[in-house]
Structure formats: C-alpha cells, structure tokens
C-alpha cells in the first residue's frame, strides 16, 4: 500500500511542478509563428512547418532549432527598419508641429502688422497731407513692400529703404506741401537728395532707420531661426536605418519570433543602446539644440520696444507725420537751403503756390482721429512668450530621444522577463546575478553621421546670430541708464502729444516687460485675429495613426492570443500531459 501511495505522490508532484518548469530546450511549435508572419506578409509561405536548424540565418542564429527561414529573416529586417523610421517620425511629430504651426502664424501675423502699418500711414497722408497726392502713396507702398521682403531674407538694407522713401517723398513735400511749386532750375534728381543737406525732416529719418533696423532685424532672425528649427527636426525625423542598425533592430524585435517567443519584449538597456546607435550620433546635437532654445527665448524676450515690429510699425505713421510737420515748420529755412543747393541759374523770384486750407489744417486733423493700435492684450509678445514656453518643454529632446523611442515599446505580460538579444532573461537580476550588458556593434560609440554634422553646424551659426541680435539691445538699454528723458527731436514746438509712440523701450503692460524664463505657464490672453483663423487651418492632427506604426505590437496581439514570454507553447504540452496523468491516477485508484 505504501509503495503505491509513494508512486501516486510522485505523480502528483510531477503534475504540480511540470507546468511551471522552464526547460532550457523547449519544444518549438511553428504554427503561431507562421500565423504571425502571414499577418505581416499575407500569402507568403516561407515559415517552415516544423523547426529547422537555421544554418542559413545571418542574424537570428539559434542555439538549437528555429522557426525562421532566410527569407523570413530578410523580411523581418525590412519591417524592423520601417518600424524604427515610423517610430522616429511619430516621436518628433509634436515638436515639428509646434514649430511649423507657430512659424506660419508668426509669418502671417508679421505680414498683417505690415499691412496695418501701411494702411495707417496712407490714412495719415490722405487725411492730414492730401496735397501730396498719389506719389506719396506710392512711396509708402514701396517702403512697406521692401520691409516685407527684408524679413523674408532679401539682401536689402533698412537704412537704404528709409533713405529711398524720404528721397521720393521730398520733391512732393517741397513743391506741394511747402508751396514752392515748379521752381525753375531745380531738377528732380537734386530734390531727391536735398532733404539730407537741408535737414528738412529733422532727426526723424534717423530715428526711423534706428527703429526699423532693430525691429526688422529681430523679426527676420526670429523667422530664420524658426525655419532652421523645422529643418533640424525634419532632418532628424527622416533619418534612415542603415545596414548595421537594421541588423541590430532585427535582433532586438524579431529574433525572438524565431524562437516562438511572439510576445517577448526587449530589455531596456539593449533597446536604449540599439536606438542610440541607430540615431547616428543625434545625442551630439543636444548641447547645440539646448542653446538654440535658450537663445531663441532670449531674443523673443528682447523683442519689445524698439525691437518689436508691432510696436514700431504700427506707430510708424507718427514718425512720418512728425517729419512732415517738421518740414512745414521750417519751410523758409528749407526752401532757402534747397535753392542754394539745387538752383544753378541766377535765382529768380517765383510766385509760390499758396498753401491750401487742406494743408494748413494738417496739424489739427490728427488729434480728432482715434488712435489705430491693437488691444494691449492682443500682442505678438504674448504669443511669442506662449510659443517659447511650449518649446522649452523640448529643450532636452535630443538627449532623451533614444529613451523616448524605447518608451513606446508595449509592456510585456510577464514583467520579470525580457529579451537580451539572445535569450529570455530576468529583467531585474538579483544582487548575486551578473547583469547582461548590451554587446556588439550597437554599443560602440560612432562619430555623427554627415547629415547630423551639418545640422550641428547650422545650429552653431544661428545661435551665434541670435546672440548678436539680442546682445546689442541689452547694451543699448544699459547705456540708456534706465530710460531717462529724451531731448525733443523736433524742437520746442513739439508737444508731448505729438511724440506719442516715439519713446523707445516703452511697455504698455508691465507684465509684458518681464523675461520668459521662470514665468511658468503663460497667461491666457486674447489672440490676434489671424492667430484665431490660422489655428483652425493649421491644427496638427492627433498622433493616433502614428502610434499604430510604432515598434511592433507583435502579430499575435491581433489574433487575441496572449502568453508568457519565454514559455509560449510549453503550458499547452504540460496541460495535455497533466490531463493524461490525472486519468491514469483515476484508473489506478479504481
């Protein structure tokens, strides 16, 4: 009786222990591997019916038998590279979308500011100086066209733009506004340059040059930096996996399939090392990218006062109006100086064209017209601050790119095991166990790819340019000594009301004069109408589609099956054996 009980006890022990054992050489079942592969490549029947030696495999070389053929390995290599590229595009999509959307918004907003500035200037000339006629309108239109082309990257010089504008405006000013008419002996060409020698417009042309130079240059560099940011991210997003990278990805993701481990997940150190090697040295971009974000933020914070295109251009009509009023106030002096410079024949007295009532009323019309300014909250400064705040969230983008790609790996059902490139191993080895380190070509540090070296050089260049544009503003403000009182540029006759908009460095909102860093989330503020319109047209699609293209959610997931990594088919065989033993015991007891 006792020997029989011992036999039954031994059999019961086998029943309990066998299903949970993990043999070193498990029996492979290639049926699920075939189903998984045909899900990826329908109609392809390259999966062997039974395990084979795998002697022709180049990467997924087994210690024993395998369920993969050489053609399967080639196909797995191709899809591994595609998954890597799709995952990289999805990871970069949010950053790329942020820069692209804001570049388009700012481009259109700057164009809108120029259009509003042009319209307000034309309105001033039409209402306050109607005698200047269509010629003045043409000069204004050309000036703003040149400004628009400049911020887009033209080789024009801002000082030359302003000089050309006043050169076209002065003959009209001299003949129509100052009442000199068609004076004999004075050529049009001489009049074009006479405003400089006669100081007809006072210091206002120089003031206009200074403000436009600073604001337009800052705007131009800001847009240039945004476009370069798009290029940098776009280059990274479209990196292609090379031969060595493809082999490493194959070993990382699909070699477990050959061992019928369809739900095996790679160990984290191996994944990070492999991604780092495949990214072609993009970690070298990180310090330059971080400097790019910081320098762009510094420029955005400095773009106020004389470096803010909105503040300068929307008040440009004030400077032009004061310049014309300066010429009218100095009519006798200007006329005499122009005659001395341009009249070569003996001067003869000519009857001056009387100044019409519409000319004399110029100084009173402007005070009855409402100011043409934006709502103080609808500022480009606020929008720039909001953009920089979002961009700072990506300041470590390149240092964590490999980690981000590995974070998109689906979690395994058995959290204690992972694939180390050769076999399933403990994900968290105990203190007495040797930790498996990544090995092979993927762990070697390589020099950056040529395309990465190119974007590093471009980042260095734009960072230097951003510093050059930002630093002069800091030095200029230091020289101002905190913004003391200015000398009235047009003499004692100009009132404070006339100088509206001419104070440099003014801030309409105290909060807007602070820097960007350390402010936390930007306050919710009104947007320029163009922002509201473009936000709908340029909205970035969600990344659901991209998420579906990430590193392989293995084909067995689609069939609804799930198993423990490292033991995909052992439980099935053990279950059958267990049922057999139970039946045997039952019959024996009977």
UniProtKB/Swiss-Prot annotation:
Under the subunit heading, UniProt states: Heterodimer; disulfide-linked. Cleavage by a furin-like convertase results in production of alpha and beta chains which form a disulfide-linked heterodimer.
Q: In which tissues is it expressed?
A: Maternally expressed and is almost ubiquitous during blastula and gastrula stages but becomes restricted to the prospective hindbrain by 24 hours post-fertilization.
Keyword Cell membrane in annotation: yes
* Modifications the protein undergoes after translation, according to the UniProt entry: O-glycosylated; contains heparan sulfate and/or chondroitin sulfate. Cleaved intracellularly by a furin-like convertase to generate 2 subunits, alpha and beta, which remain associated through disulfide bonds and are associated with the cell surface via the GPI-anchor. This processing is essential for its role in inhibition of hedgehog signaling. A second proteolytic event may result in cleavage of the protein on the cell surface, separating it from the GPI-anchor and leading to its shedding from the cell surface.
Query: What results from gene inactivation?
Result: Morpholino knockdown results in severe defects during epiboly with most embryos arrested at 60-80% epiboly.
* Primary location group: membrane
What the entry lists under Pfam families is as follows: Glypican (PF01153)
The encoding gene is: gpc3
Residues listed as glycosylation sites in the UniProt record: 119, 234, 414, 504, 517
Q: Which UniProt keywords apply?
A: Cell membrane, Disulfide bond, Glycoprotein, GPI-anchor, Heparan sulfate, Lipoprotein, Membrane, Proteoglycan, Signal
What GO cellular component entries does it have?
cell surface; plasma membrane; side of membrane
**InterPro entries tied to this protein:** Glypican
**Which protein family is it in?**
Belongs to the glypican family.
Query: Which stretches of sequence are listed as region Disordered?
Result: 429-450, 476-520
* Name of the protein in its database record: Glypican-3
Q: Where are the transmembrane segments?
A: none
Cellular compartments annotated: Cell membrane
* Chain's role: Cell surface proteoglycan. Negatively regulates the hedgehog signaling pathway. Positively regulates the canonical and non-canonical Wnt signaling pathways. Binds to CD81 which decreases the availability of free CD81 for binding to the transcriptional repressor HHEX, resulting in nuclear translocation of HHEX and transcriptional repression. Inhibits the dipeptidyl peptidase activity of DPP4. Plays a role in limb patterning and skeletal development. Modulates the effects of growth factors on renal branching morphogenesis. Required for coronary vascular development.
State the organism's lineage. Eukaryota, Metazoa, Chordata, Craniata, Vertebrata
